[in-house]
């Protein structure tokens, strides 16, 4: 708790924006309540240890105790604390690995019909989703503009835009790697050859 309070004090030292008198009083009240609760807890602990010491003395009998310091007992308690910490740490690491395994990669399939749909596609890239874009329902000029916008956004967001079909592109975030072999795309009835530049060929 002391470490947490110290960090809170350090953070509050630098946080001077919008500080009011009420907030200052609330912080002071909280710290005084925390100090009081710590003092009460310490008193209870000392009373418990005193009670256990007196109970041990009664069990031992008339043999007087010269010192309350017991190095073996303190050593055992320290070892138990260390063991409990070491046992708790792998559990936390295991939970993180389970979360990563449970996360699934989703691929959104988009058929943009107008230039304004490009913003929706870029928004999906921002939240780290893969997007398969098919420009079959767009006019050639609009598709080129849309593709240029998406390509610029993917470069800014460190994404990747790859052509996977005659009118299809795969947009992936930086954390997704795609290995596409060279493939011959069959010519269909719709002749489209979008390129990343705005010039018409």
Swiss-Prot record:
One of its GO terms (cellular component) is cytoplasm. This is Cell division protein SepF. It is found in: Cytoplasm. Cell division protein that is part of the divisome complex and is recruited early to the Z-ring. Probably stimulates Z-ring formation, perhaps through the cross-linking of FtsZ protofilaments. Its function overlaps with FtsA. Its main location: cytoplasm. GO terms for biological process: division septum assembly; FtsZ-dependent cytokinesis. The keyword Plastid does not apply. Residues 43-54, 82-92 have a biased composition (Polar residues). PANTHER family: CELL DIVISION PROTEIN SEPF. Homodimer. Interacts with FtsZ. The keyword Isomerase does not apply.
């Amino acid at each position: 708790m002391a470490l947490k309070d110290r960090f809170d004090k350090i953070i509050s030292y630098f946080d001077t924006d919008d500080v009011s008198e009420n907030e200052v009083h609330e912080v002071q009240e909280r710290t005084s309540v925390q100090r009081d609760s710590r003092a009460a807890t310490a008193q209870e602990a000392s009373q418990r240890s005193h009670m256990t010491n007196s109970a041990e003395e009664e069990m031992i009998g008339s043999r007087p105790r010269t010192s309350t310091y017991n190095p073996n007992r303190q050593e055992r308690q320290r070892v138990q604390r260390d063991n409990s910490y070491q046992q708790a740490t792998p559990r936390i690491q295991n939970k993180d690995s389970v979360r990563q395994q449970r996360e699934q990669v989703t691929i959104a399939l988009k058929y943009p019909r107008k230039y304004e749909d490009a913003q929706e596609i870029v928004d999906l890239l921002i939240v780290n989703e893969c997007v398969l874009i098919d420009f079959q329902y767009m006019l050639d000029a609009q598709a080129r503009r849309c593709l240029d916008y998406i390509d610029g956004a993917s470069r800014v967001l460190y994404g990747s835009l790859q052509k996977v079909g005659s009118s299809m592109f795969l947009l992936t975030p930086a954390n997704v790697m795609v290995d596409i072999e060279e493939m011959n795309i069959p010519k269909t009835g719709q002749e489209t050859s979008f390129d990343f530049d705005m010039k018409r060929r």
